[in-house]
Amino acid sequence: MKKIDIIGENYFGKWDRTRTSCRGIIINDNNILLSYETLTDTWMIPGGGLEENETEKDCCIREISEETGIIVETSDCLLEIDEYYENYKFINKYFFCKPIEKTEIKLTENERRVGMTSRWLSVTKAIDIFSKYDFYKNNDEEKRGMYLRELTSLAELL
C-alpha cells in the first residue's frame, strides 16, 4: 500500500489530534460515484470517520451505505493519504468498492444540513472538478486540501 503526505499551508508543524477516515472508490462504466454537498457545492469520494472497534473495511462499507444507500464489497486498502492542517493529522484510507445491493440512506444531521446527496459523474469530470483545488487556495484551505486529496487518490488509483 502506497502512502502519501499532503502538508497544508496552515500546518502548525506538529499535530496533537488525529482522525482516520475510510473512503470508497466506486466505478461503473467509466463513471465514479461521488458525494455532493449542495449547500457548499463540494464534491468528495464517499467515506467518513473510523469508529472505535471498527475495522477499516467495515468503516468504508458503513460510510458508503449511510451516504449513498449502496452496500459494497471492498478491496484491501490500496492507498493512504495523510493530511496535515493546523494541529491535525487526517489519515485517509482508500479502497476500491463493488456495489452489491441497495439499502436505506442514513445521513447524519450535518450531512442533511449541507444537502448531501450522491451522484454519478464521468471520471473525466470528477478529475476536472478536483484539479481546480488551487482555486480555493486563498479562501478555503479545507476545500483546497480535500480537492487535492481526492485528485491525488484518483491519479494514484485509476
Residue ranges: model-predicted function:
Residues 46-48, 107, 131-133:
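Short acidic, glycine/proline-rich loop/turn micro-motifs
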